[in-house]
Every structure is written in structure tokens, then in C-alpha cells.
Amino acid sequence: MSGTSESELKNLISSLHLNNGFLGIFDCRFPGFLQKSKIQTAIINTGPREQGGIHWITLALEPISYKLFIFDPLGWKDTQLIKFYNFSLNSLIKRSALNNSDRCITVERNTQSVQCTCAGSCGLFCIFFLYCFHFYKQNVFKSWLFQKLNGSTPSLIPCEPHLLHENQTFLYDFLNAKSVYFRKNYRTFIENTKTGLIKTH
């Protein structure tokens, strides 16, 4: 198996005490956030569950500033998500009750990749994002912790793979320091998510 499973992601969430507002793990049919007055987070796969999934992304709703944060470790635009995975974030937002409100929601998303396309670590990066959101809810992307990651132009063949590989090393070190569950399953996580797992460069 490559990547991280639903059960592994749930165990990491619990290990890092990120359960507050966490709705769970979903596939591409995620209905959206339906309670706009509460903090809510979710990890979503761009593929259907019955086919094993494809790529993990994560969403987080901050109700005070009414911001929806969308984090894709590969930094794909909506057009690229549709092209590569037949998955649309815009459609997901429109399905949500957030679209039917007297307040305008602000959508913030990353425009750079932090994960190399040669790795299977999207799920782990989603966990890291939710950790950042837990402590820096209103400005997660600008938080000092998230800014530890190098950003690169999204591409199937990365132009700066060494920077993205540095992110992977940082990610492993971070999770190893913070999560007992990650430490106990360190070898499995590394083997299933390491750089060079997929031949892209």
C-alpha cells in the first residue's frame, strides 16, 4: 500500500488531539460544511472510497472570521483537480450550506505545492495543516509553523524537488516529535509515503 489509510489518518488526529470540530474522513462525495456557526474540519479524498481513493486534501472552517481554508499539498488549481482527478472544489463549496448565507465567506487556499509528486505523503501533510489550524485558526497559512514549509510552483514534474523533499523530512521529524502513534508506526509511514515512491522526476 502507498499513502495513508483512513484508519491511519484517524489515529493521527486522535494522537495529536485534533478532534475538536473534526467531522471525519470523506471521499469525493463529501457534502460540505453544514453548520456554519461552528469550527469544522475534514480530510477529503478526491476519489471514491470503493476505488481506494486517489489524493488527500483538507478543509477547515473558521466561523468567527467566516473563512474557509482549503489545503491541497500539491497546490493544484480547480482546473487541474478536475483534469487529474475529476474532482471540483468549487462544486463542493456550492453543495455546502456556506453558499446560502447572509454573510460572504472568504475562501483561502494555498497556491503552491509543499509535497513532491514523487511521494505518497498527501495525507500526512493534511494532518500537519490541521495541526497548524488548531493553533492558528484565523491565519493558518501565514502562521510561523506553516511557513516552515517551502513552497514551489505546482507541476507534475516539480521544478524544485529538493525543496519539497526538505518539506518531507521536516514533516517526518515534526510528526515523530508530536505523535506517539506516528513514532510507533514510523517505519510503516516512511515506507508508504517516502519520496521516490512514484517516478515523476
Swiss-Prot record:
Q: Where is this site: Cleavage?
A: 52-53
Mainly resides where?
virion
Extract the GO molecular function terms from the UniProt entry.
cysteine-type endopeptidase activity; DNA binding
Catalyzed chemical reaction(s)? Cleaves proteins of the adenovirus and its host cell at two consensus sites: -Yaa-Xaa-Gly-Gly-|-Xaa- and -Yaa-Xaa-Gly-Xaa-|-Gly- (in which Yaa is Met, Ile or Leu, and Xaa is any amino acid)
Give an example GO biological process: proteolysis
Broad enzyme group: hydrolase
**Gene Ontology cellular component terms for the protein in this record:** host cell nucleus; virion component
Query: How is this protein activated or inhibited?
Result: Requires DNA and protease cofactor for maximal activation. Inside nascent virions, becomes partially activated by binding to the viral DNA, allowing it to cleave the cofactor that binds to the protease and fully activates it. Actin, like the viral protease cofactor, seems to act as a cofactor in the cleavage of cytokeratin 18 and of actin itself.
Database matches in SUPFAM superfamilies: Cysteine proteinases (SSF54001)
What positions constitute the catalytic site?
A: 55, 72, 122
Which compartments does it reside in? Virion; Host nucleus
List UniProt keywords, sorted A-Z. Answer: Autocatalytic cleavage, Disulfide bond, DNA-binding, Host nucleus, Hydrolase, Late protein, Protease, Thiol protease, Virion
> What Enzyme Commission number(s) does the record list for this chain?
3.4.22.39
Q: Write down the InterPro entries for this protein, in alphabetical order.
A: Papain-like_cys_pep_sf, Peptidase_C5
Q: What upregulates this protein? A: Expressed in the late phase of the viral replicative cycle.
Keyword set includes DNA-binding? yes
Additional information: All late proteins expressed from the major late promoter are produced by alternative splicing and alternative polyadenylation of the same gene giving rise to non-overlapping ORFs. A leader sequence is present in the N-terminus of all these mRNAs and is recognized by the viral shutoff protein to provide expression although conventional translation via ribosome scanning from the cap has been shut off in the host cell.
Task: Tell me the subunit arrangement.
Answer: Interacts with protease cofactor pVI-C; this interaction is necessary for protease activation.
UniProt lists the family membership as follows: Belongs to the peptidase C5 family.
Role summary: Cleaves viral precursor proteins (pTP, pIIIa, pVI, pVII, pVIII, and pX) inside newly assembled particles giving rise to mature virions. Protease complexed to its cofactor slides along the viral DNA to specifically locate and cleave the viral precursors. Mature virions have a weakened organization compared to the unmature virions, thereby facilitating subsequent uncoating. Without maturation, the particle lacks infectivity and is unable to uncoat. Late in adenovirus infection, in the cytoplasm, may participate in the cytoskeleton destruction. Cleaves host cell cytoskeletal keratins K7 and K18.
Protein's name in the database:
Protease
Which species is this record about? Ovine adenovirus D serotype 7 (isolate OAV287) (OAdV-7)
- Print the organism lineage: Viruses, Varidnaviria, Bamfordvirae, Preplasmiviricota, Tectiliviricetes
Encoding gene per record? L3
